[in-house]
Amino acid sequence: MKQDMIVILDLGSTENTVLARQIRDLGVYSEIHPHDITVDELKALNNVKGVILNGGENRIVDGVAVEVNDEIYTCGYPVISVDYPGSKCEVQYAELPNDEVMKDFLFNVCKAEANWNMKNFVADQIELVRKQVGDKKVLLALSGGVDSSVVAALLVKAIGKQLTCVHVNHGLMRKNESENVVEVFGNQLNANLVYVDATDRFLGKLEGVADPEEKRKIIGGEFIRVFEEEARKLEGIEFLGQGTIYPDIIESGTKTAKCVKSHHNVGGLPEDLQFELVEPLAQLFKDEVRACGVELGLPAEMVYRQPFPGPGLGVRCLGAITRERLEALRESDAILREEFANYGLDKKVWQYFTVVPDFKAVGVRNHERSMGYMVVIRAVNTIDAMTASIERIDYDILEKICQRITDEVTSVSRVCYEITPKPVATIEFE
């Protein structure tokens, strides 16, 4: 089923994604496009029912206010504007319309159908993937994160054994994560899964490296090398599956975007290993990816897995990584997650994890002075990850977590709770 679509033209608003999400939540598909799109480009899009010109504070580029092409106003679709002083629309709003006003525009003015939902999306993507891939083979780097897991589940449903998933355990995963990947995809979904335990290889490369950026480069570079080695062992691969999602594309930037981030996923492969990309989640926001995972039947612990940095625990084991500190980090993090789940905080807090600095602190164990590692707990809430506030956790809960960590992870001498918001601090420590 081809979904009806509302096109949002970006004229500098910081609320493009808010508007896009509002429309999708009302059951109509929406996309954000550059302000200078032509009518021909607009009409080439599928099932357009209406256009919204979304202005805002970033409309000035190089000293000049950007404007839409005049032909947009007579493109044949209903057009309204939001926070756009230069608008020539008959219907203009100073701020984002509420749901009732938006419903009137979507369903009475544009005559759009409320046919945007995950059941339709999955059915459409299965059809599109089969059409794109045909009888060829697809390779996917399966990290176990939400995006790659949902892509894998969708591709398994679409093309079955034509997909080969490669899971690289770099030794920096959280407790039992690699085992869960093997269980779900190798055993339950019966996917073609190549499991590579490269723990010794990664930790060997990281030995003595304290600089965070250098650690990231080593982990990223080594991952590409391992993935390349596995890819070369396989024959007939013509496509590369990727977990690209809609925010990745938006963040690639438009002329009005102040913060530009180059879009990439599993990049860095050599020229002779370039594949055609299969990106079935490229239309979805993060929460929609999770909803897609639920529709595909993935287990909740995988679908609602928290954001996790690409270098894994490597950037939470501060400074030069040692196996002992890495184990303290992995075990303390598992305890934190278990207790947050016990108290219902796992559904309330956006992101929470532990960090282990690269120094020891004095403590007392078995009535004797001892030196142990410090564990730092971080728990934050955010809407867009650009700013974040701390979660005010009850002291009784913190005390229980502290007690468990110091009892069960004997290399730890003390536990701290970190209370710095973003800004001034970033969410991650490295």
PLM feature spans:
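Extended catalytic-interface subdomain
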Residues: 242-244
